[in-house]
Amino acid sequence: MRGRLCVGRAAAVAAAVAAAAVAVPLAGGQEGSQGGVRRGSRGTTMVKKRKGRVVIDSDTEDSGSDENLDQELLSLAKRKRSDSEEKEPPVSQPAASSDSETSDSDDEWTFGSNKNKKKGKTRKVEKKGAMKKQANKAASSGSSDRDSSAESSAPEEGEVSDSESSSSSSSSDSDSSSEDEEFHDGYGEDLMGDEEDRARLEQMTEKEREQELFNRIEKREVLKRRFEIKKKLKTAKKKEKKEKKKKQEEEQEKKKLTQIQESQVTSHNKERRSKRDEKLDKKSQAMEELKAEREKRKNRTAELLAKKQPLKTSEVYSDDEEEEDDDKSSEKSDRSSRTSSSDEEEEKEEIPPKSQPVSLPEELNRVRLSRHKLERWCHMPFFAKTVTGCFVRIGIGNHNSKPVYRVAEITGVVETAKVYQLGGTRTNKGLQLRHGNDQRVFRLEFVSNQEFTESEFMKWKEAMFSAGMQLPTLDEINKKELSIKEALNYKFNDQDIEEIVKEKERFRKAPPNYAMKKTQLLKEKAMAEDLGDQDKAKQIQDQLNELEERAEALDRQRTKNISAISYINQRNREWNIVESEKALVAESHNMRNQQMDPFTRRQCKPTIVSNSRDPAVQAAILAQLNAKYGSGVLPDAPKEMSKGQGKDKDLNSKTASDLSEDLFKVHDFDVKIDLQVPSSESKALAITSKAPPAKDGAPRRSLNLEDYKKRRGLI
C-alpha cells in the first residue's frame, strides 16, 4: 500500500516536470503536426522512463528513501522552470494541454482509472499554481527591467555639454592671448616714434630734446606700472575662475557619487523589499494551506466519528503522511520567517546609527584646551567663539594637601574685576564653566595643562547623569575639533592686529618707552589747554604724575644694587686711608729707634764743589795755614775774587820774601786750580746744591693726593 502511494506522488511530480519541459521551445524547430507528435512522444517516453524508475525504486527502498526521492524530483522541476524563465519563449497553452493529455494517457496505460482521475485533479491544481508563480516572476522581472531601462535612459546630472566644452576652450584661448600681451607705448627702445617724430625731435634744441625724452621715460614707467598691475589683476581673476571651475567640477562629481550611491541604495532596498514581500507571500500561503489542511482533518475526524465506521489503512497512512507534510511545511515557514527576520535585522544594521555619546576620556581630550593655548589666544579676536563648547581641566582646590581637578565645559567668556598675570601677558578675562548643574567663573590661570584622568572623567559622567543632561556626541566633538584646527591656522589682517595691540596695552602696567609717552602726554596737555578744556588737561596731568612716580620707582629699583656697591667701595677707600696713615706713623717711629748699620746701602746724591767754596770756609782754611806756619802773611785773603791778579802778585812777593829763608819753604806754595765760571752757572749750581737731603733709612713710596695735602698742612 505504501509503495502505491509513493508511486502516485512520483507520477504527479513527473507530470509537473513534463509540463515545465513542454514550455521550453525547440531551437530551429518548425511548428506543425509532425512537431507536435514528436514532442508528445518525447514527453511520453520521458514520463514512462521516470515512472518505471519510480516503480522499481518503490518496491526496494524504505520509507526514509521516499522523502529523498520527492526532494530530488522537486529540485529537477525547479531547474527546468529556471531554464524556461531564462529563455523566456511565448508559451502555447494548447501544446501544454496536449502534453498533459499524453501524460494522462500514459498514466491510464500504467495504473488504474479511478486513481488516475484523482491524480489528474491534483496535477491540474499544481499546474495552475505553477502558472501563477511564473506569471508573478515574469511581472516582477518586467518591472525590474523597466526600472533598469528608465535608469539607463535617464540622463545623469553634472555632465558637461558640447556648448560648455566649446565655451571653456574659447575662454582658455582668450587666457593664453591675454598672457601673450606685451607692453607698447608707441615708441621704440630709443624713445622715438615714426619718421615725423624723429624729424620733430631733430628740429628741437638739445635741451628741449632731452627734456622731451625724460618726460617720455617717466610716462613709460607710469604706463608700465599700470600695465603690470592690470596684468596681475587679470591673472588673479583667471586663477579665481579656475578655482571656481574646479570647485564646481568637484561639487558635480560629489553630486554624481551621491546620486549613484542613492540609486544603488534605493535599488538594493527595492530588491530586498521585493524579496521580503515574496517571502511574506510564501509564508502566508503556507499558513493558509496549513489551516485548510487542519480544517479538512477536523472535518474528516468528525465525519468518521459520526459514522462510527472502522478506519481504513489508506486513510490512516494518508493522515500520517499529511502530518509529515504539515511538519515539513511548518519547518519551511519557520525557515522563511527566520530569513525574513534576519533580513530585517540586516536592514536595521545598514541604517546608519545615531551618533554615539562620548564614552572614553581620550575622545574628550580631543577638545580639551590647555593653559598654554588659552595664554596664546586670550587676546585673539576668535577667542570667545572658539573656546565656547570646549572642555578644560580646572583646579578647584586641595584635599589632604593634594590638588583636586574636575572636568568642566566652557559655556562663555566674561571679564572679571581683577587684572592678573597669565604667563607672559596680563588679562582680566574669565571662563564660565559648567560641571553638571553647577556653574561658576574661573580665571584662566587655574586651568591645567594635563589631560583628563579616568576618575575625573567618570565623576563628570556621574554629574551629567544625575543632572539629567546629555553627554556630547562624537559628531559634536568632531565639529569642535575642526574649529580648534581652524583657530590654529587663523590668518590675521590689519584690523585684527590693531585690536590685539589695543587689548595688550589695556593691561600693561607701564609703557615700553617713558620718554615717548611723556612727550605724547605733554603734547595732548598743551592742545587741551589751547582749546580751553581744563578737565582733559587735569586728567593728562594726573597721568603725567603717575608716569613720573612709576619712573622714579623703577629708577630706585634699578639703582638699588648700584648704590649698595658704591657705598661699599667708599667705605673701603676710607678704611685704606686710615690704615696707610697708621703704617706711616709706625714706620717713622721705627726709623727713629733704629741704630746705624754701616752695611746698609743708602741713597745719596753727589755734590759739585768746584767754584762753590764759601768765603767763610776759605777764611778758615787760611787761618789754619797761618797758624801752622806761624806767620800772619795773609790777613787780607778773604777778599773778593774779582780783584784778580794784582792781589796774587802781592801775595807771591810777600811769601817769597818770607820763604826765602828756608829752602823747604820755597817749594811750599799753593797752586790755584779753581777756574773762573760765569755767574749764571754758579747760581744754577747753587740752586741744584740746595736740594733737601733725603732722610736716612726712610723707604721711598708713592703718595696719594690726600697724603700730600696732609703733609703740606692743607687738610
Curated annotation (Swiss-Prot):
Has keyword Transcription? yes
Feature: compositional bias, Low complexity = 163-175
Cell compartment(s), UniProt: Nucleus, Nucleoplasm
Lineage start: Eukaryota, Metazoa, Chordata, Craniata, Vertebrata
Record's compositionally biased regions (Basic and acidic residues): 197-218, 246-256, 274-296, 637-652, 697-709
Q: Where is the composition biased (Acidic residues)?
A: 58-70, 317-328
One GO location term (cellular component): Cdc73/Paf1 complex
In alphabetical order, the GO MF annotations are: single-stranded DNA binding
One protein family per Pfam: Plus-3
* Modified residues annotated as Phosphoserine in this record: S58, S631, S660, S702
Chain segments carrying region Disordered: 28-218, 233-362, 632-654, 679-715
UniProt cross-references to InterPro entries, sorted A to Z? Plus-3_dom (IPR004343), Plus3-like_sf (IPR036128)
Stretches assigned to the Plus3 domain: 358-489
Q: What is this protein called?
A: RNA polymerase-associated protein RTF1 homolog
- What keywords tag this UniProt record? Activator, Coiled coil, DNA-binding, Nucleus, Phosphoprotein, Transcription, Transcription regulation, Wnt signaling pathway
- PANTHER family in the cross-refs: RNA POLYMERASE-ASSOCIATED PROTEIN RTF1 HOMOLOG
Q: Where is the composition biased (Gly residues)?
A: 29-38
Sorted alphabetically, the Gene Ontology BP terms of this entry are: blastocyst growth; chromatin organization; endodermal cell fate commitment; negative regulation of transcription by RNA polymerase II; stem cell population maintenance; transcription elongation by RNA polymerase II; Wnt signaling pathway
Biased segments, Basic residues type: 115-135, 233-245
Positions carrying Phosphothreonine are: T60
According to the UniProt entry, the note on domains is: The Plus3 domain mediates single-stranded DNA-binding.
Report the transmembrane regions from the record: none
